[in-house]
Regions:
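Short solvent-exposed coil/turn linkers within tandem alpha-helical repeat scaffolds
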Residues: 19-27, 41, 55-64, 90-99, ...
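Short extracytoplasmic
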Residues: 1-29
Length: 157
């Protein structure tokens, strides 16, 4: 359905997955894929609905947390900053915590809240694995705010 570019077919396929097989990993994966397709075809409301469903209904926490991260990013793109921060307010597993902190930093940076952004990016720096390539991006964001990411290492939460 995604490859065909037929939005109606995609919506029907996604609805069928969530209606018939809501507790399966396939339903969550189809919601994530549908959301990506909706975003690529400039249908942000449909993307938000798919991500909201996955964040609340996914049978596995990994898919639910990934959906929350993507939903918060989409909300931030739409300048719904308070809504995005609320989406990120529920705790994340350690595997996702650094990414969630990074998204929070992006939201604060977009609002010109430098101190809050620095704290969030510093949290992300500490939470991400030391060998994670993503840390380089977080380091660049901290540098842009005049901070040394190595200084974030020893700081407390």
């Amino acid at each position: 359905s995604v490859g065909s570019g037929d939005r109606g077919k995609l919506e029907r396929a996604w609805a069928a997955m969530t209606d018939r097989f809501p507790s399966t990993t396939f339903a969550a994966q189809s919601a994530l894929l549908a959301a990506k397709s909706f975003q690529m075809t400039d249908k942000p409301d449909a993307a938000k609905a798919a991500l909201q469903w996955a964040s609340e209904s996914a049978s596995d926490q990994g898919s639910a947390q990934l959906a929350r991260l993507r939903l918060a990013n989409l909300q931030a793109q739409q300048k719904a900053f308070d809504e995005a921060l609320k989406t990120l307010s529920k705790p994340f597993d350690p595997a996702f915590a650094g990414l969630a902190s990074d998204v929070q930093g992006d939201i604060f940076a977009a609002q010109n809240k430098s101190q809050e952004a620095i704290k969030a990016y510093s949290d992300a720096w500490r939470q991400l694995e030391e060998n994670a390539e993503y840390r380089r991006l977080v380091a660049a964001k901290l540098n842009a705010l005049g901070q040394d990411p190595e200084a974030a290492k020893g700081a407390s939460k």
